[in-house]
Every structure is written in structure tokens, then in C-alpha cells.
């Protein structure tokens, strides 16, 4: 089943409210963020696992000079185990319970558009950087989705644009190599993330981009 132009589909997770809408063109501005729904040469959808969780990054950005972390307990389930250990090390009162050792901050690969780049050139550059130059693009799809995400924990709204990207590498080519990119710690198959809160809407995005005409 496809999605018609300007039709809006809504997904909600414990943390996010996501609006997905098919559009004709990606606007070009200094704040435009573009993402690739990557498909391997053997047909697997790819997703990135971020090196640092968004929750922990937000805490670090608000850290004061006396090195005290003030942390809402609502954020704890959205952090990596090593980040929780760092918080626990500085804890003066309270406790940390119900830690999920399997948490991963899943993201679509991509980034911010440079004003001198085309959309596709931006995605080629970002994929090259985030994969330590392991990913090369075979072709892009023609369908464009606008993704509007409201982060309910921080009450912020993020807008991005996504298109399918068919790459030359197989899943095997990418799954057994270490990545040293500052932002991405791992590239993996979305099919391995069925228990993640984001899996449902990420799967929908891939299906729409690959199967829509």
C-alpha cells in the first residue's frame, strides 16, 4: 500500500511523535536535513546506531561548572549502559534502576545540506563519512518523504527529508567491520531491531520509499 501526495501518517513511540508525508521536492536552505533509507545489494534495509544517545548528549550540554548531572528519570531508558555508568559515578542522591543493556539510538544515515551541494551529493558525502568510506551509492529512489518528529521528552521538533538509496555493498560487507566515525558506532540491518521503539515507523518509511511509485 502506498501513500498519496501530502497524505499524513502518524506514529507515536514512548518518546516521539512522528508525522510522515510524501512530497514532491526537498526545499534547499541552510537548515535542510536529508536522510537516506539505505538498501544493500542483497536487499536489506540499513540503519545506523548512534555513538552517543541524544538524551546523554542533552545532559552534557546542560552540565554546569561543578560537574553535577541533573537528570530526569524519564531519560534513563533512552541511554547507553556506559552513559548510565557515568551518571551513576557522579550520583549524589537517588538511584538508577531498570537499566536496558540492549538500548541503541537508531538513526537514519544522512545529515545537514551544505549550500553548495545538491541533495544527492550531500547524501553521498554523508554516507561516505558515516560508514568510514565503506558505502558507495548505486542509485537513488524517486519518492521523497518529509519526516516531522516531535521529541516529547525535550519538547523539540525536528524536520528532515528522506529518500531511498540503493548501495553497492551487501550486508555482509558492512556488518563485520568496525566504524570509527565520531557519530556512528555501528551500521546494521533494520530487521535486527524489531524490539526497538522506532522499528515500526522506520519499517514504514523503508516500505514506502522502496515500494511506492
From Swiss-Prot:
Question: Which InterPro entries does the record match to this protein?
Answer: NUDIX_hydrolase-like_dom_sf, NUDIX_hydrolase_dom, Viral_VD9
**The motif Nudix box: which residues?**
111-132
Required cofactors, per record? Mg(2+); Mn(2+)
Q: What is the active site of this protein?
A: 126 (nucleophile)
What is this enzyme's EC?
A: 3.1.3.-
* Mutagenesis / variant outcome for changing residue 126 to Q: Complete loss of mRNA decapping activity
Taking every annotated instance into account, which residue ranges of this chain make up the domain Nudix hydrolase?
A: 30-209
List UniProt keywords, sorted A-Z: Hydrolase, Magnesium, Manganese, Metal-binding
Purpose: Decapping enzyme that remove the protective 5'-cap from both host and viral mRNAs to commit transcripts for decay by the cellular exonuclease XRN1. Accelerates viral and cellular mRNA turnover to eliminate competing host mRNAs and allow stage-specific synthesis of viral proteins. Acceleration of the turnover of cellular transcripts may even promote the shutoff of host protein synthesis.
Any Pfam family: NUDIX
Effect of altering residue 158 to A? Answer: About 98% loss of mRNA decapping activity
Give me the reactions it catalyses.
a 5'-end (N(7)-methyl 5'-triphosphoguanosine)-guanosine in mRNA + H2O = a 5'-end phospho-guanosine in mRNA + N(7)-methyl-GDP + 2 H(+)
Q: Name one GO molecular function term.
A: hydrolase activity
What is the official name of this protein in its record? mRNA-decapping protein OPG121
PROSITE patterns (alphabetical): NUDIX, NUDIX_BOX
- Can you tell which superkingdom this protein's organism belongs to? Viruses
Q: Which residues bind Mg(2+)?
A: 126, 130, 183
The protein's induction, as recorded, is: Expressed in the early phase of the viral replicative cycle.
Q: Per UniProt, where does N(7)-methyl-GTP bind? A: 16, 50, 151
Query: Can you tell me which family this protein belongs to?
Result: Belongs to the Nudix hydrolase family.
Amino acid at each position: 500500500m502506498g501513500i498519496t501526495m501530502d497524505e499524513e501518517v502518524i506514529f507515536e513511540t514512548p518518546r516521539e511523535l512522528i508525522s510522515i508525508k510524501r512530497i514532491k521536492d526537498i526545499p534547499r536552505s541552510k537548515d535542510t536535513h536529508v536522510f537516506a533509507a539505505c538498501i544493500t545489494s542483497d536487499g536489506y534495509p540499513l540503519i545506523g546506531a548512534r555513538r552517543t544517545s541524544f538524551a546523554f548528549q542533552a545532559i552534557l550540554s546542560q552540565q554546569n561548572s561543578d560537574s553535577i548531572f541533573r537528570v530526569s528519570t524519564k531519560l534513563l531508558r533512552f541511554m547507553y549502559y556506559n552513559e548510565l555508568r557515568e551518571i551513576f559515578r557522579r550520583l549524589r542522591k537517588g538511584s538508577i534502576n531498570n537499566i536496558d543493556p540492549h538500548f541503541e539510538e537508531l538513526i537514519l544515515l544522512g545529515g545537514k545540506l551544505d549550500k553548495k551541494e545538491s541533495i544527492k551529493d550531500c547524501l553521498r558525502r554523508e554516507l561516505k563519512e558515516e560508514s568510514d568510506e565503506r558505502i558507495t551509492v548505486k542509485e537513488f529512489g524517486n519518492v521523497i518523504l518529509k519526516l516531522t518528529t516531535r521529541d516529547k521528552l525535550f519538547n523539540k521538533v525536528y524536520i528532515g527529508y528522506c529518500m531511498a538509496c540503493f548501495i553497492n555493498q551487501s550486508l555482509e560487507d558492512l556488518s563485520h567491520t568496525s566504524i570509527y566515525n565520531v557519530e556512528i558506532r555501528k551500521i546494521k540491518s533494520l530487521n535486527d531491531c524489531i524490539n526497538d521503539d522506532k522499528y515500526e515507523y522506520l519499517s514504514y518509511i523503508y516500505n514506502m520509499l522502496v515500494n511506492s511509485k
